[in-house]
Amino acid sequence: MAEEQVLNTHNASILLSAANKSHYPQDDLPEIALAGRSNVGKSSFINTILGRKNLARTSSKPGKTQLLNFFNIDDKLRFVDVPGYGYAKVSKSERAKWGKMIEEYLTTRDNLRAVVSLVDLRHAPSKEDIQMYDFLKYYDIPVIVVATKADKIPRGKWNKHESVVKKALNFDKSDTFIVFSSVERIGIDDSWDAILEQV
């Protein structure tokens, strides 16, 4: 079923930003969290699959997202953009604070249905990417791995890069893996299929 028949994906807005659970929305709408390294393309992913240009702000300055940003989609679903990890210029104490905030959300939020874990298709996953995937598997949280920036690689090499990413993550075949490009609009339907399957 096409996503337009399920919900109007263009009817989306940023709802609120939260530093801890006391600020989370108090209802039972399903939520999909988005996690990934700084500058992996989370904001571009959100904007692309929602068909909006600047709903999630893209930044040339990594580490800009410092709160959990909740996006309301047609009053039926929420995306939760979590702070990008792996940015060296953020202080150790700040990184620890973000880590605690992300962990609290991922392990205690009943609304959470799945996590879209974004990785860069061009490179082997970072230590933080692997830690995030392992964390989600440990807590039995459904994972959708989205490999971004596919347009930067010739199509003939996608399978090779996908294999490298999956091997490094020790990828569970029961999870979903999607090759994605915001520039070429590749992987949008597959992403929605995977998301809606979880909600």
UniProtKB/Swiss-Prot annotation:
Signal peptide feature range: none
Obligatory cofactor(s): Mg(2+)
Gene Ontology biological process terms, A to Z: division septum assembly
UniProt keyword annotations, A-Z: Cell cycle, Cell division, GTP-binding, Magnesium, Metal-binding, Nucleotide-binding, Septation
GO cellular component, one term: cytosol
Gene3D superfamilies (UniProt xref): P-loop containing nucleotide triphosphate hydrolases
Functional note: Necessary for normal cell division and for the maintenance of normal septation.
PANTHER family in the record: ENGB-TYPE G DOMAIN-CONTAINING PROTEIN, MSS1/TRME-RELATED GTP-BINDING PROTEIN
Name of the featured protein: Probable GTP-binding protein EngB
Organism: Streptococcus pyogenes serotype M49 (strain NZ131)
